[in-house]
């Protein structure tokens, strides 16, 4: 179990994360759709996430979403590294009705994000462009290389939910224990 707390003039976030969990969820960011996406991430990764955020929602959800990504990324980095005896790579294609999204990731300790999800506008009152900000913050702070690519879809909610679930399943697969691998790098370090 790792714990990260972060307080700025814009947000106050408390996060507990357990990689060896079973997807126990306690999430409250004040942004309903975003909470729903984080719950999907926790459930489908098998990672216990306890996250609360008090943010400047009177402005908009940008700081809340981005800062939650920063904190979740920091918690993942603290929980994952130094890395040893895991698969390291994970990928998944997840469908939700007409939508399909693929995520491939590497626990590389080299942050990089490719985000090719073609949605714009809002789901309810949630600006969908914030999802890219979230994944950029997670990848950057966790030290992950992440590719999220929309294969098909029309419904924004379905496309974004498939994206979060694909990331979750790919992460779960990358974290699968494999004692034969030791440090999963020809360099001997990640």
UniProtKB/Swiss-Prot annotation:
**Does the UniProt entry include the keyword Amino-acid biosynthesis?**
yes
One of this protein's GO BP terms?
L-histidine biosynthetic process
Tell me a Gene Ontology molecular-function term this record carries. imidazoleglycerol-phosphate dehydratase activity
- Give the record's GO CC terms: cytoplasm
Record's catalysed reaction(s): D-erythro-1-(imidazol-4-yl)glycerol 3-phosphate = 3-(imidazol-4-yl)-2-oxopropyl phosphate + H2O
User: What broad class of enzyme is this?
Assistant: lyase
The answer, when asked if Nuclease is one of the entry's keywords, is no
What InterPro entries would the database entry show? IGPD_sf, ImidazoleglycerolP_deHydtase, ImidazoleglycerP_deHydtase_CS, Ribosomal_Su5_D2-typ_SF
PROSITE patterns documented for this protein: IGP_DEHYDRATASE_1, IGP_DEHYDRATASE_2
Q: Which SUPFAM superfamilies match?
A: Ribosomal protein S5 domain 2-like
Write the Enzyme Commission number(s) for this entry. 4.2.1.19
Subcellular location per UniProt equals: Cytoplasm
Source organism, top-level taxon: Bacteria
Pathway the protein acts in = Amino-acid biosynthesis; L-histidine biosynthesis; L-histidine from 5-phospho-alpha-D-ribose 1-diphosphate: step 6/9
Q: Which residues form a coiled coil?
A: none
Which of UniProt's keywords are assigned here? Amino-acid biosynthesis, Cytoplasm, Histidine biosynthesis, Lyase
Family named by the database record: Belongs to the imidazoleglycerol-phosphate dehydratase family.
Stored PANTHER family? IMIDAZOLEGLYCEROL-PHOSPHATE DEHYDRATASE, IMIDAZOLEGLYCEROL-PHOSPHATE DEHYDRATASE HIS7
> Which HAMAP family does the annotation name?
HisB
Q: What is the designated name of this protein?
A: Imidazoleglycerol-phosphate dehydratase
